[in-house]
């Protein structure tokens, strides 16, 4: 989506008295009112994946724990601070992102703690109300709670919609029902192929996640040797009279992380979804897995890439600039104008 974007030397932005942008272009001649800024003037950043609710966990988690270790830390630490402090941390990080040039955030919400901050923030947020649960018998009650959370979000004036978490934390029943509800809204956000443990669990029914779930008496997903993306699509497509009709599934599909995705998964998603996007959170991937997504492969497959920060439980800072820097550091062949596009217009 960003291959035709180019940086404009001596570019200018002309503002009205109230700050409204009224003209942009290449500066031919300076005037007395021209203000020069060293650097690049760009549109507002779009943080396409964030868990702002976890802002109170800054500096708490151990790095390189793997997904199973990360989940254990979440279970122990998520509510380790009082609610008042959690809300204060949310506001502080929302304010910081706005100051750093973020104009919109695709944020994951598991509860309503961020709603009051979002409703008064100058930053636009699209809240994906995320659910998870490994037992099929719990799906109805979880979906009922999701409907109540959605009602609360809408009453606060927040744009929100249902969202599944991922194949490795959900029963087939809950994954399908929450995904259908998300697609009905026109938007779905989904954690995809974030860890090698996820791959092991879905492809072989083995690995640290499988061991952890079994030790806690939890159900594990059915094995799909073709991998998590195939599993996800099989579940939401459905079968027989419940099968989603049409050649492609309509709506905007945001696949998040993709650290261990492959060519077959990318092709399958492109073939199945009408408008797929691929959100990368490289600093989070390094923090948890000491790994990075296959950026060059995604580019070769002409994937629509976006950038996100994830949360302060898996990142040292919520900074779009730092995410862009890490892309430049490890993938120096990617042009700056393309990375800017990922961080802005694609999001």
Label each residue range with its predicted role.
Residues 81-161, 165-183:
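Active-site loop-helix segments enriched in His/Asp/Glu that coordinate
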Residues 88-97, 277, 281-288, 330-347:
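C-terminal helical cap
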Residues 291-347:
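His/Asp/Glu-enriched, well-ordered alpha-helical/loop segment
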Residues 56-88, 126-129, 196-250, 272, ...:
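Active-site gating loops and adjacent loop-to-helix segments of metal-dependent hydrolytic enzymes
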Residues 121-125, 181-187, 248-251, 268-279, ...:
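Glycine-enriched alpha-helix->loop->beta-strand junction motifs that scaffold or abut catalytic
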Residues 44-48, 105-106, 125-129, 160-164, ...:
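Hydrophobic faces of well-ordered beta-strands that scaffold small-molecule active sites
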Residues 1-30:
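N-terminal metal-binding scaffold of metallo-dependent hydrolase/deaminase domains
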């Amino acid at each position: 989506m960003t291959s035709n974007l180019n940086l404009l030397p001596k570019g200018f932005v002309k503002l009205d008295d109230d700050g409204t942008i009224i003209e942009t272009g290449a500066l031919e001649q300076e005037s007395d009112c021209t203000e020069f800024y060293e650097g690049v003037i760009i549109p507002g950043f779009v943080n396409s994946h964030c868990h702002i609710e976890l802002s109170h966990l800054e500096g708490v988690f151990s790095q390189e724990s793997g997904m199973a270790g990360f989940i254990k830390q979440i279970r122990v630490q998520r509510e380790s601070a009082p609610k008042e402090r959690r809300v204060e941390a949310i506001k502080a990080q929302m304010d910081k992102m706005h100051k750093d040039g973020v104009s919109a955030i695709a944020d994951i919400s598991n509860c309503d703690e961020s709603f009051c901050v979002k409703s008064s923030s100058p930053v636009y947020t699209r809240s994906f109300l995320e659910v998870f649960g490994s037992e099929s018998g719990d799906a109805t009650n979880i979906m009922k709670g999701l409907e109540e959370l959605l009602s609360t979000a809408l009453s606060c004036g927040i744009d929100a919609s249902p969202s599944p978490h991922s194949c490795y934390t959900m029963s087939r029943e809950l994954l399908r029902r929450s995904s259908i509800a998300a697609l009905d809204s026109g938007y779905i956000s989904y954690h995809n192929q974030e860890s090698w443990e996820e791959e092991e669990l879905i492809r072989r029914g083995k690995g640290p996640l499988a061991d952890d779930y079994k030790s806690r008496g939890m159900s594990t997903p059915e094995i799909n040797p073709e991998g998590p993306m195939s599993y996800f699509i099989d579940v939401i497509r459905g079968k027989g009279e419940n099968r989603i009709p049409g050649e492609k599934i309509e709506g905007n599909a945001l696949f998040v992380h993709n650290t261990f995705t492959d060519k077959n998964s990318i092709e399958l998603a492109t073939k199945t979804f009408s408008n797929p996007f691929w959100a990368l959170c490289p600093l989070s991937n390094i923090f948890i897995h000491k790994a990075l997504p296959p950026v060059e492969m995604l580019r070769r497959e002409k994937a629509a890439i976006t950038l996100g920060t994830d949360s302060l439980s898996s990142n040292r800072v919520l900074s779009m600039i730092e995410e862009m820097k890490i892309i430049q550091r490890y993938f120096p062949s990617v042009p700056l104008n393309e990375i800017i596009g990922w961080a802005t217009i694609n999001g």
